[in-house]
Amino acid sequence: MEPSELASKKAYRGLPMEGMLASWYAKNTAKLAADFKACARRIAAQLAPGACVLEVAPGPGYLAIELAKLGRYRITGVDISRSFVRMATEHAARAAIDAEFRQGDAAALPLADETFDFIVCRAAFKNFSSPMTALNEMHRVLRPGGKALIIDMRNDASDETIDSTVEDMRLGPVDAFLTRAIFKHMLRRRAYSRDDFARMAAASPFARADIEEAAMGFDVWLRKSSATT
């Protein structure tokens, strides 16, 4: 599938993550604390002291907060959900973390050019209505030589892999049933293949892309050229 087809295919956002739905999501993902800590450590290994980091679609802010605990980084999060921006701000204040969360669209980031050293987008890219525009925006706000990391579900994740993933979340029976259904009948349908990510990366301004595979998803590493734009 060509990048132009991918852009038209994704002409929706799915359910708006506001109010009670956002609260339900935050409650369940809070149980993934170990995953957020591990992801934060992987990212911190890529960062110099004082690095400026952007999380696109941080949701309740759990990953950004764990990353902020690991070093003197300048952390910013942009999410389209006002509920998530409020939650993330409250969670950061409770953790005594200096991080800024603001409302905005991944396809029109309310940020200046060449501001960040590193960008991460976890479990959200498949929901963007304009994925190629979002990639271009990530490139725009990265400094020369900066990196971006997209972590997301793969569209061929098996039912067994999904079941195992949900089991590891240790949810209650109702929440586990709903989460399995959402993964299998909503999120997997929106997710991309390895080839999809490779084509989008090739069509983007990024100088280099490396894709790492796991049973449930992909880590897509993108690098901006070190040449001044």
Regions found by a protein language model. Give the residues of each.
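Conserved class I S-adenosyl-L-methionine
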Residues: 1-48, 66
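C-terminal alpha-helical "lid/dimerization" subdomain adjacent to the S-adenosyl-L-methionine
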Residues: 32, 151-204, 210-212, 217-220
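Short glycine-centered segments of the SAM/dcSAM-binding site in methyltransferase folds
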Residues: 52, 146-147
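Class I SAM-dependent methyltransferase SAM/SAH-binding core
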Residues: 54, 60-108
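A conserved beta-strand element that flanks and buttresses the S-adenosyl-L-methionine
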Residues: 120
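A short His-aromatic
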Residues: 126-127
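A short glycine-rich, Lys/Arg-flanked "PGG" loop and its adjoining helix->strand segment in the class I
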Residues: 132-144
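C-terminal lobe and adjacent flexible extensions of AdoMet/dcAdoMet transferase-like proteins
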Residues: 219-229
